[in-house]
Amino acid sequence: MQIAAYERTWIEGLNRGDVSVADNVFASDCVIHINGSPERNLSLDGFKQMMSGLVAAFPDLHITIEDQITAGDKVATRWVAVGTNSAALGNVPATGRQVRVDGLILDRVVEGRVVERWEQWDQMGMMQQLGLA
């Protein structure tokens, strides 16, 4: 599989609400760096837990890959996510509002698995669209 396909597989899984796809895409010992996360470096289990919460809060979540670039063992992906907050997000009740969020991911792929990820997305913009900031 070409390295850009790993991110497409992950996003297709999220669009179906299937976070378990992560087990086929990420190495079990991968490290995930996400801006604004209380834990700057998440394990795969921590990442899946976080993403499960997002998928539950935005059950109609749809992510579109806008651009991808590969170089060596890395793939950069620019994405846009759209979804309606129809369930609680952590301890915050659902707002019923739709959001559009932009983000960037840089994955390093080794032996067919993502071993490290750097992810940046507009968390403040999402909070503003939800009326929470």
Regions found by a protein language model. Name each.
Residues 1-133:
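C-terminal and inter-domain tail/linker signature
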